C-alpha cells in the first residue's frame, strides 16, 4: 500500500476542526457523542482522511464504552497497531495504514472470535452503506 503523506497544514485545510484534532493530533471525541456510536447501518467504514476501507459493520458491536467498537479490522493491512505510552498509560493505538490517521485504541476485552475491542472515534470514520 502506498502511503499518503501531507503536511499538518494540508490536513488542517482538508479536515474540519474536530477531525483534525482527533485524526492528526491524536485527540479523542467525548464518549457517546459520535454519530456512529449507535449506528446499525450495514456497510464499510472508511478513513475520513484518505477514504481507505477500515472496518466492516459485520464486526461492529455495542461495547457500552461510548465509541464505535469493532472486533476486527478488514482483512489485510487496513490498520496498524502502535504502542502508546501517553497520559501515563500503556495502550495500543490504532492508526490508518495508508495515511497514519489516529483512529483510536484496541483493547483485549472484546467478544469472540478475536477477543479484541477496536475502540474507534466516529469523527475518523465515513460509513459507506451497503447497497
UniProtKB/Swiss-Prot annotation:
Residues 8-130 form the MsrB domain. It is an enzyme of class 1 (oxidoreductase). Its cofactor is Zn(2+). Transmembrane segments: none annotated. Its EC number is 1.8.4.12. GO terms for molecular function: peptide-methionine (R)-S-oxide reductase activity; zinc ion binding. This is Peptide methionine sulfoxide reductase MsrB. It comes from Pseudomonas savastanoi pv. phaseolicola (strain 1448A / Race 6). The lineage of its organism: Bacteria, Pseudomonadati, Pseudomonadota, Gammaproteobacteria, Pseudomonadales.
